[in-house]
Amino acid sequence: MALTIGIVGLPNVGKSTLFNALTGNTVLAANYPFATIDPNVGVVNLPDVRLNRLAEIFGSERILPATVSFVDIAGIVKGASEGEGLGNKFLANIREAHAIAQVVRAFDDPDVIHVDGKVDPASDMETINTELILADLQTLENAIPRLEKAVKIKKGDAAQLETYKAAQKILEDGDTIISRAKDEKLELAHLKELNLLTAKPFIYVFNADEGILASEEKQQELRDMVAPAEAVFLDAKLEADLVELSEEEAREMLEMNGQDESGLDQLARVGFSTLGLQTYLTAGPKEARAWTIYKGDTAPQAAGVIHSDFERGFIKAEVVSFKDLDEAGSMAEAKARGKVRMEGKDYIMQDGDVCDFKIGG
């Protein structure tokens, strides 16, 4: 599976600059609203040093890391649901994303205009969330009557209709669905086919200046503002510069800015964590590769990510943890140390498992 994250935010908050840094693209990043009109899609490799080590051990010809797809859409303004700015039709471009990354301006720069005339992260987040809520309300207002008719003639799911109405009530209260789903015991699976934006996990990406990046206290204030959602802090312009540098130069620049991890790596890591994802590894002479699965997936489900036939034909899996294989230096030595196991259909995969699946016809 490929993880897809939709990037939203007001105009001029640094969305396109961040997207350029993420993807190495050069989409228009301008100092005026609506520089991005058509959605930009980019696929980003997830950094994983384990793959380099696996390629060394197995003599792999190539390395294939797990990937994240990012979709950058036009800036949203207050009143978009009623046609302000470019309206909200382009939100359809991110409805199938697994998560929403909301980019929030947290930097002062008189040369970069703010669409509302002032830098106010709380107000900006409220504007975006309100527009996403209104977009979801429009979707539910169309879906509920159709499902009510289906339920009346015994062709619809009454429990699903209840969930639709409960979600509508949450939105009418001015809240995102994801923020209250747990407390309301909402069955999110009933909403899946609607691809509601506010039912997706949120990540808040604060495009910040040095005053915030160097202050744990200020970062904590913003974290508290968005909790229980995850927050990422970065300087989009710095991130764009980092991707132009060598690995060593980038590390030095990060250290100069008091950071031990780039914002892009942080965003990818948080995206995985937010969605409950992990990776397992495969390796051989041709390639060393990372595969994305959900935490809690079984060995057959993991095999199915490679090919659906592998899940159906799963017999067993030869498994060794990356840590044990790294220490052993070869599969032969890992086996000699008793670190390689044969696992069956009920085995729950662990992050960093190195696997060789045995598949029947």
Language-model features, listed with the residues they occupy:
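Glycine-rich, phosphate-binding/catalytic loops in enzymes
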Residues: 36, 86-87, 117-120, 220-223
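Short, intrinsically disordered, mixed-charge
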Residues: 24, 56, 92, 96, ...
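Conserved G1/Walker A P-loop phosphate-binding module
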Residues: 1-111, 141-143
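Amphipathic alpha-helical transducer elements in NTP-driven molecular machines
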Residues: 34, 48-51, 64-70, 84-98, ...
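C-terminal-of-GTPase-core extension/linker across diverse P-loop GTPases
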Residues: 2-8, 13, 19, 146-348, ...
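Conserved Switch II/interswitch segment of TRAFAC-class P-loop GTPases
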Residues: 42-47, 74-84, 95-157, 170-184, ...
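Residue-level signal for pocket-adjacent positions within structured domains
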Residues: 22-32, 39-41, 49, 53, ...
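Short, flexible surface segments
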Residues: 96, 350-351
